[in-house]
Curated annotation (Swiss-Prot):
Top-level EC class as recorded in UniProt: hydrolase
Amino-acid positions noted as binding [4Fe-4S] cluster in the UniProt annotation, renumbered to this chain: 793, 1115, 1118, 1124
Organism: Clostridioides difficile (strain 630)
Keyword tRNA processing among record annotations: no
Name listed for the protein in its UniProt record: ATP-dependent helicase/deoxyribonuclease subunit B
Summary of the function given for this chain in its UniProt record: The heterodimer acts as both an ATP-dependent DNA helicase and an ATP-dependent, dual-direction single-stranded exonuclease. Recognizes the chi site generating a DNA molecule suitable for the initiation of homologous recombination. The AddB subunit has 5' -> 3' nuclease activity but not helicase activity.
InterPro entries, sorted: ADDB_N (IPR049035), DNA_helicase_suAddB (IPR014140), P-loop_NTPase (IPR027417), PDDEXK-like_dom_sf (IPR011604), PDDEXK_AddAB-type (IPR038726)
Organism ancestry: Bacteria, Bacillati, Bacillota, Clostridia, Peptostreptococcales
Gene transcribed to yield this protein: addB
Gene3D superfamilies in alphabetical order: 3.90.320.10, P-loop containing nucleotide triphosphate hydrolases
Oligomeric form and interacting partners: Heterodimer of AddA and AddB.
Known cofactor(s): Mg(2+); [4Fe-4S] cluster
Entry keyword set: 4Fe-4S, ATP-binding, DNA damage, DNA repair, DNA-binding, Exonuclease, Helicase, Hydrolase, Iron, Iron-sulfur, Metal-binding, Nuclease, Nucleotide-binding
Enzyme Commission numbers on file: 3.1.-.-
Amino acid sequence: MGLRFVLGRSGSGKSTYILDEIKKEAQKNETTSIILLVPEQYTFEAENRVSKLFLGKEKDKYLRVRVLSFKTLSNIVFSQVGGLTDVNINSSGKAMMVYRAIEDVSEELNVFSKSKSQSGFVSSITDMISEMKQYNISPEMLENISGELDNETLSLKLKDISKIYNSFEGKLHENYVDAQDMLTSLTSKIELSSYLDGACVYIDEFTGFTPNQYNVIKSILNKSKSVNISLTVDDINYIGYSKSDMFSRTKFTYSKLTQLCNEEGIKILPQVNLNTGVIKRFEKVKELQHLERFYNAYPYKIYSNPTENIKIKEFNNLYSEVEEIAREIVHLVRDKNVRYRDITIATRDLNRYDFLVHSIFNEYNIPNFIDKKREAKSNPIVILIISALEMKNRRYGYETMFRYLKSGLIGIDNDDINLLENYVLANGIKGKKWFDEKWDYRITQSLSGQESEFELELKEKINEIKNRVLEPIVILQEKLRGKNRVKEICRYIYEFLLDINMPETIESLIVNFKDKGELDVANQYSQVWDIVVDILDQMVELMGDEIISLEKFIKLITLGFDEYELGLVPPSIDQVLVSSVDRMKNPDTKYLYLVGTTDGVFPLITKDSGILSDNDRESLGNKGIEVDIDSKTRSFEEQFLVYKALTSTSKNLTITYPISDHEGKTLRPSIIISRLKKIFPNIENKSYLVEENKNTDKDILKKITVKSPTFNELINVIKNYDSDGYNTEEINSIWLDIYRYYLKDEIYSSITKKVIKGLSYTNQVHKIEEKKIRSLYKSNSLSISRLEKYAECPFAYFIQYGLKAKKRKEYSFTPPDLGTFIHNILDRFSKELLQDNLTWRDIDEKYIELKIGIIVDEIILKIPGYILNSSERYKYLAYRLKNMLTTAITIISQQIKQGSFEPIDYEVKFGDNGKYPPIKMVLENGQEVSLIGQIDRVDEFEEGENKYIRIIDYKSGNKSISLTEIYYGLQLQLLVYLDAILESAKDEDMNINPAAILYCRINNPIAKFNEDKDDEEIQEAILKELRMKGLVVKDSHIVKEMDKSLIDGERKNSLVIPVGLTKDGNVGKSTSAISYEDFKLLRKYVRHAIKDLCEEMLSGEIRIAPYKHKDGTSCDFCDYSAICQFDSTIKDNKYKNLNNKSNEEIIKMMKGDVN
């Protein structure tokens, strides 16, 4: 019986020495156990190393040797003397039990009364309880010490922890034990077990132990033949230490174990000192020897020789950092016969690098294993279960429903799910609407008209998908009504999973993943299903008969899933290990890449956080209560981790860092970098911030790795080459050989040809054949609004009307919806006026208010699921729209009463089935097109043999007419409408003349006042705010017939139209008025512009040509900008600039174009 320390610096051969000792001991003809005790995460690697000791004829000797952790040692001892029947609660069950404990004492809490409901609190308390148990601190001890403290906050905090801890212990020990209890029990049961009698025990890879583990070691020392413990320390003649000492943790462990042996009367055998001579791991590499010896030495010694085996590399970002490492690994394996297993990638922040490394290494065909446990809660199986349970509490909202539907595990085709999703989003389906017997919402969201056969069939299909989706959900939700026992809810969940064929689906997925070689993913799905079953079983065991609300059950099962992690076994022996520096366990590493070595990350800046602060821990320490170390001590221990990382390779060390993160934020190099530069002034410090385009054979060969990345490099070389031609003299012959290789490759041949062709690609598109464009646009009938869209940008028009691409409709009341609604109401109102034998001059605000209320209510109630009837919010919006329309129509009535013009028609269509025939136009190639459209309102005034026409278009926005926009084809509608009316009436006996083309604004007027105004002045301000905008004929007589208040000189500026009169009664120059001749010119120019646009469109022109003017561009609100990728900095991406000229200049330009 005795303890022997195996001491040495990192790399001195402590583990190798222990393995040699194990082999020697195994050679003896004895039957007692040989035990290698290591931390849980090291068991796999340790078993692998031990198995290699006994090959061939010696393999029988292996039977005496066991690699154990404290947990597996417990299982062996308990199997001998009892204890295995105690139900061991895992971290998942423990978290659920802690939650219940908090709930039970929630009314008694002081400091944590508000924190108890916060995210992460249960996890923090669970960790706190574990820490207390590890350090043998009972709830009673916490309660007692709280009364001795002067710090009131800490005292109350300890009382709260004690109450929760005590409640947890009471629940736990009814039927269970946890990991800490097992260690406590192990201490006593080792004495009863014969397993350790005469055993040789070797303890390796630990830096320290918890009090419970010290007690277990004490029991082991008293039972076994010998105990050997390895510790990483520097000066074995001086084991005294301070907290700032890099080896403080291991020196503390040495001191603690020595004290334990002295107290127990256990002999301490002579130490094994491995610090003599050259450190074994670095005996062939002097730089690494020097690094190990002097990195933390003060003063340090400079290594003045050339430094070849330690390198520093700087990169722009994480991606370029990892990709360069991948290239190096390919060359190491291919050119230097290095094995993948000899290479380790280590980082202090594995979460930042794991996905990136895995993706890039797979691209480079580098086998790799990410030594990181995956969270079970992110697996689709868990997401499906939680979503199914949350549906009711979250009112069957979109997020919850489609998290469930898109899990890929419910046996419904993705296309069907997407169809259902579009319909649900467009109609705002949530809550009870999901359970309507039949959904009858319109597919097209139209306010009028019959549904087509296509719409009806599609609606039937959607309802069929909905019913399939809901069938198992309805069954589950019926069972979950009210409060249930936990065991009943668990049974309902399992039955639900059977209803959707979950076991068969998972089994099928696992087979598919294995067939594709994705063993990692297959293993994850297999584990998660076992986890689901385990959690349900554990909940039944823990609280099966407890009656619980669904909300509380969801919190508990979510806590359970949060605690589970998926452990993965390396699928191959020869692979690159990717690990966090604190879990690094590849003893055969020859090439170490320490990545992401940035300030604050490595060494990690530890924060004072958690339930107990650093000051709290210090106060407890002063009272003789030992707890875990504080953040300051952790910061000092981080230096030990840096030391361990830097000394984990036997041949080559490369330290890399990026200067910016994923978001482009600046990163600074770690203090490790500056320290290395001081010790090794000749160290290679290579920067990859600016890519070197060296064309030497050596540099090119470095870029040639495996097929996919090399292909990308080849494409970049060609892409960066002279765009005017392919000059073989300037491209290195190696690249030409590579190019020829890919042209012959079975897989890459066609890809190479396509990519080379694509290098000349721009986002500019070419003309489409006329035959194809006609088949896309089909009819020769064109609406004016579509022509305006084409004038804005031919490509956007092609996407919208040629390819018929649509933005996904979501359940909201958008400006276009408002415009459609307003037009529909105004059309209905105007027609009902005629049915009531009334004119605009006969009605007052009371009539308007009543009629609008009836019309709006009819529309809202007529359409199933109409948004304005969907909620109190939207019902209030409908109420406001009634008021707005009442006000706007009252203004329209006043505008009409103010003049002599009478509305003669509404929603006037010109087209094949319209009141007026379409406008026919013959193009240069002889093709005839028909222009169709719809006029909101036509007003008329007759005087003698003259008739004057006024075209009105209703707009919810504040729009006016611009001659510049007419010139460029962006505002054609009103002039085309005017032209259509004038042309259709030219055969009448009267002279038909244009009077105006105007936009009538339908909106709530917002008038600003600087002082109090009376009612008449307020009314005048409202009329002015809603005054129509557009172009009026420059004829003072006709102007006065549109606003009679101008006749007697009562006012100079009209409140109806955008015109003012001068003192002598003429139309003012600064108003929106043009002559009859100019109106005639505009009509002629518009025909000319339309003809040009039609010819261009039907010729197949779909170029990306958005316009730009002082107010913005046509790209500003375009739904298709992500498709065209227009960028004015790219060649050939130019805006069509609309030159802002005066009306006189525009008129002159128009004359030049039409003559």
